[in-house]
Every structure is written in structure tokens, then in C-alpha cells.
Amino acid sequence: MAAVASWEDEIKQDIRIIKGDMVYENLTQKIIGAAIEVHKHLGPGLMEKCYECAMVYELQQLGLDVKTQVPVHLMYKGMDLMGGTSEKDFLRLDMLVDDAVIVELKSVETVKDVHHKQLLTYMKLTDKKVGLLINFNESRLVDGIFRKVM
């Protein structure tokens, strides 16, 4: 009887980690591992919010600080373009982990260029160097994981 591989083994098998000095490598590996664990239990096809709640649980179990739906202010020449608008109109990060890595969650048929641009824009606006785009609507989650570094 073969043992079930842990999420750490799955990461090593399914995700090619670039050798060398990766920014927040250990943290992003933990986040990806948590996403794989969530996907194993929930599978594809649910609403994004379901995955967000499960991810918060998994990341907190790992001792990580997780903030969700973090408002992002859009500044233009010193003016806050979001100032005076209702809170629901704010740009929001799906997740910010350890105040270092932005995690944008999706549950879409196909990740499009606009999803990558959204993450890169959030990284620029918040001055965060690393972001993960994770699409849970994949049979193999690793096919829906994208790591961005600025």
C-alpha cells in the first residue's frame, strides 16, 4: 500500500523551483502547499470565497499572519482617487500573507492576461515584491499557480 504524498512532496514533484536566491521562497512554498491542501479537499468548481476561507484556515494553522480583502488606495499625483468613495468601491487584495506576499485567488475556467495584470498592478500599488495568482478551477492545481516577482 503506497503512502499518500504530503503537500510538501507534491510541491517538490509538481513545481519546478528556480535554484538560487528566490525572494520569499519559503513563504511562497508554504502558501502553495496550503493551496494544494485546500484543493485536495475541496477540488475545483466552487466560488472564490470558499477557497479564500479555507486558505485563511490553512495559512493560520502554519502560523502565518493573513489579512483578507485588504483595501488598496490608488494614488494619482498625491491625490487618493479612492478618497470619498464608499468602502465597497476600493480595490482589494484577496489576501496579504505576513505583510509580504499578495495572493490573488481565482476560480475561473481560464486565467487571462487581465488576471496577471491585476496582480502586477496590486504589487506596484502596494510596493510588494512577490505575488501569487492561484486558480482553483483546475484539475491539477499546479497548472493554475503563477508566481510574480517585481
What feature does the model see in each segment?
Residues 1-23, 77-87, 93:
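Intrinsic disorder/low-complexity segments
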Residues 7-72, 147-150:
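Solvent-exposed, charged helical/coil patches
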Residues 27, 97-98, 127:
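Residue-level preference for short coil/turn positions at secondary-structure junctions
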Residues 42-44, 77, 130:
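Short glycine-rich loop/turn motifs that provide flexible caps or phosphate-binding loops at active sites
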Residues 47-48, 52-100, 108-109, 139-150:
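Active-site metal-binding core of divalent-cation-utilizing nuclease and nuclease-like domains
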Residues 103:
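Conserved beta3 VAIK motif of the Hanks protein kinase fold
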Residues 106-150:
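Nucleic-acid nuclease catalytic cores
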